[in-house]
Amino acid sequence: MARVKRGVTTHARHKKVLKQSKGFVGRSSTNYRIALERLEKALRYAYRDRRNKKREFRALWIQRINAAVREQGMTYSQFIAALKAANIELDRKVLAAMAFDDPAGFTAIVEAAKAVRG
């Protein structure tokens, strides 16, 4: 039986890791052993942060809405409760964008929410 040599597959695997670690600093991009560790850690961070990103953006939208609503004399929680009572189904992403890009439209929504609130 012939001896199996794995030089080709090993070389391909090393090349793949080094290609993915391109842009890392120092030996993290040139030395396979170090590059593999850095790449594994980078991929773990990427996986974690794809989930964190959703939380962080929601928090940012809430902060922006809160700041815009306070200028109109309401708090964020009062505003959201009034929106639900008025059956205005705009999500926080859209509300934050409106507060930033279309202040007049956002003011109209706040006034509609205030009217329902009483």
From Swiss-Prot:
Pfam families: Ribosomal_L20. GO terms for biological process: ribosomal large subunit assembly; translation. It comes from the Bacteria. GO terms for cellular component: ribonucleoprotein complex; ribosome. The keyword rRNA-binding applies. The keyword rRNA-binding applies. Coiled coil: none annotated. GO terms for molecular function: rRNA binding; structural constituent of ribosome. Keywords: Ribonucleoprotein, Ribosomal protein, RNA-binding, rRNA-binding. Belongs to the bacterial ribosomal protein bL20 family. Binds directly to 23S ribosomal RNA and is necessary for the in vitro assembly process of the 50S ribosomal subunit. It is not involved in the protein synthesizing functions of that subunit. This is Large ribosomal subunit protein bL20. It comes from Acidiphilium cryptum (strain JF-5).
